[in-house]
Structures are given as structure tokens and as C-alpha cells.
Amino acid sequence: MSFDLAFWHQKSVPTVEEAAQIYDQLVDGLSGVVEANSAVEDFHKAMISVFPDLAEENMDESPWTSPLYVTSECVIATISWSRSGEVPSVLLDLASRHGLTTYDPQEQAVYGITGEASTR
């Protein structure tokens, strides 16, 4: 079992409905959904320095159930449920430090750069 978190740069924190639309488009592989931003690449580098991307060599200890989905616009992580107590808080902190919005589609929650959630 796993769950997703999505990260992107946006000047203002979107509503849950807006974030859900953005997430759906990003998951569908559309580009131009949000502006590309170097903060996304910087976040990705910081993220894989803590939790390396899934590879054959680290499958047993990786928190990811599939390789990270990374573009110039977003990072989408599919996290193993067994690591749900540890990984999200680290990623939320990193995202906040890089000025990124985080969307949790399971909880329908949006986290802005303050790390505070807004939900339906």
C-alpha cells in the first residue's frame, strides 16, 4: 500500500479544489500546468540526498514504491505506507524551505510554505 505527495511552486497557495485539478493534470503528464521553477529542482536534489530515488540496489530500504516523477514543474512521490510515519514530515519541511506547495490527494490537503494544511 502506498500514498502520493505532490510538490510544485506556486506564488499563492491554491485551494484544495485548485490543487486537485493541478495534481490530476500533472499525474496525466501535462506540461505548462504550473510554472517551471528552479526551486523544484533544488527541492528534488535535497529530497534525494535524504531519501535516494528508488533503484534496484535500494529497493528494500527505499521509502518509494516507484521512482520519483520529476519535471521542471513538479515532483510526485509515491511513498510506502510502512514509511508514512517518517517520510511525509521530512518532505513537508523540505518543501516549505524551498517555497513549494505540497498536495496530499489522499487527505485532500494543501500545505503552503508555512507547513500548515488547508483541507475541505
Located regions from the model:
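Acidic (Asp/Glu-rich) sequence patches and key acidic residues
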Residues: 1-120
